């Protein structure tokens, strides 16, 4: 099965609590084992439990692709070491890189796959270049449908992308060129336009908030390359 509906302690906003790539899922601590097992089965990569600055909202605070995961620069040393040790145990060669900036919610401000990255226009050009260098991809600054929180306004994998329903045709073409995949508009969790906050997805599957409707699931499957 490549798509499943889940809740995290009754919250349908799965993307807030994790970071998914084609090599690993970094997930908040404290979830039931049966839910971790669903994530492993659907996304088909190791699942590593973690916290960032003792917070569970690691999908808000961090972002990444197969090359690197970017976290706030003041992440605790013990947390960073725990993540790196887990990656070593699983043989995961993804770097974990603290990034110095005045912004904390990096996951809300960075949208990336293994082919490109869109960073919020809030970042300076110099910061954007550094982010692109860390992630090892082409990077552009911008917004989606006028929204600076591009990481919450979209989800993108190496197979496809889904973004805020008010994105224009021109934006979809631009995003498709940047990420080298087809990008569509859609919603999740019964009409929520901030799809990046609603799901965890990679090239192998997607877990989405339990409030997501049947028509929304069909659109998500199409956009992320499973149909």
UniProtKB/Swiss-Prot annotation:
InterPro entries to which the protein is assigned, alphabetical: eIF6
Any GO BP: cytosolic ribosome assembly
GO molecular function: ribosome binding; translation initiation factor activity
The entry's keywords: Initiation factor, Protein biosynthesis
Keyword Phosphoprotein annotated: no
SUPFAM superfamilies xrefs: Pentein
Source species, domain of life: Archaea
CDD domains in the record: IF6
Assigned protein family: Belongs to the eIF-6 family.
PANTHER family membership: TRANSLATION INITIATION FACTOR 6
Role description: Binds to the 50S ribosomal subunit and prevents its association with the 30S ribosomal subunit to form the 70S initiation complex.
Cross-referenced NCBIfam families: eIF-6, PRK04046.1-5
Record protein name field: Translation initiation factor 6
Native species: Pyrococcus furiosus (strain ATCC 43587 / DSM 3638 / JCM 8422 / Vc1)
């Amino acid at each position: 099965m490549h798509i499943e509906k889940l809740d995290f302690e009754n919250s349908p906003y799965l993307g807030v609590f994790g970071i998914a790539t084609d090599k690993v899922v970094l997930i908040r601590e404290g979830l039931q084992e049966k839910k971790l097992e669903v994530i492993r089965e659907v996304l088909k990569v190791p699942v590593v439990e973690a916290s960032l600055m003792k917070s569970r909202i690691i999908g808000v605070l961090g972002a990444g692709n197969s090359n690197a995961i970017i976290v706030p620069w003041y992440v605790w040393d013990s947390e960073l070491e725990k993540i790196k040790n887990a990656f070593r145990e699983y043989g995961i060669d993804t770097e974990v890189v603290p990034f110095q900036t005045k912004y904390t919610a990096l996951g809300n401000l960075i949208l990336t796959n293994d082919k490109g990255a869109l960073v919020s226009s809030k970042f300076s050009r110099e910061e954007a270049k550094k982010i692109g260098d860390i992630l090892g991809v082409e990077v552009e600054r911008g917004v989606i449908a006028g929204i600076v929180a591009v990481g919450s306004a979209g989800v993108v994998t190496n197979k496809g992308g889904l973004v805020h329903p008010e994105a224009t045709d021109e934006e979809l073409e631009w995003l498709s060129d940047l990420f080298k995949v087809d990008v569509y508009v859609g919603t999740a969790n019964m009409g929520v336009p901030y799809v990046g906050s609603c799901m965890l997805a990679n090239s192998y599957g997607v877990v989405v908030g339990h409030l997501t409707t049947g028509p929304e699931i069909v659109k998500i499957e199409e956009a992320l390359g499973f149909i």
